[in-house]
Design a protein with these regions (language model features):
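Cell-wall polysaccharide-cleaving catalytic domain and substrate-binding groove, primarily
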Residues: 1-181
Length: 181
């Protein structure tokens, strides 16, 4: 099991001054936050992405997949271009496709774009397939972030791309070996 999944922190959020809800009582990982449940890990992701939207607006940057991932996984620490390619491939979103601000959604179809982005980023961060992503936990994370904003009947599985073998031609998985048992 990967470090992110073991920590209930699917996108590997690092320790910081942020006071997250649902943090596990015992923090044994020196680098990454450990959450009580995967839903709380996803809650933090939704909140971070909402904050990105505000920052991008102030900086007059478009809020699209490429900019989000470049901020999340900067080139100084990651192969950002490979990360973007994989997220685009897995999510079915375009690299320059605008993503709606999570806290201000008016249309569930648009909000599903953000859920697909989060699911694809979970795959890249943890080396898993879209089939293995817990979409229910992603939506529970949204509900924890903004209670009462989403109608429960709206939960829907994100389409899964079957052929993920293309990852290997672009991605050097050995760089992530330290995150795995």
């Amino acid at each position: 099991m990967t470090r992110g999944l073991r920590n209930n922190n699917p996108l590997n959020i690092r320790h910081s001054a942020d006071q997250w809800q649902g943090v596990a009582t015992t923090q044994t990982d020196k680098s990454f936050v450990q959450f009580q449940s995967m839903a709380y890990g996803y809650r933090a992701v939704w909140k971070i992405l909402d904050t990105y939207r505000l920052r991008f607006r102030r900086e007059r940057l478009p809020y699209h997949v490429r900019n989000i991932i470049t901020r999340w996984a900067p080139p100084s620490e990651n192969d950002t271009e490979a990360y973007i390619r994989h997220v685009v491939r897995l999510s079915g979103l375009g690299g320059y496709e605008n993503i709606p601000r999570p806290s201000r959604y008016r249309n569930f179809e648009r909000l599903k774009k953000t859920a697909r982005l989060i699911a694809a980023m979970t795959c890249v961060e943890n080396g898993i397939s879209m089939k293995e992503v817990d979409m229910e936990a992603i939506w529970k994370g949204y509900d924890l972030a903004w209670p009462g904003r989403r109608v429960p009947e709206e939960v829907e599985e994100v389409p899964v791309l079957e052929d993920v073998s293309v990852w290997d031609e672009y991605w050097d998985w050995s760089a992530f070996a330290s995150n795995w048992d």
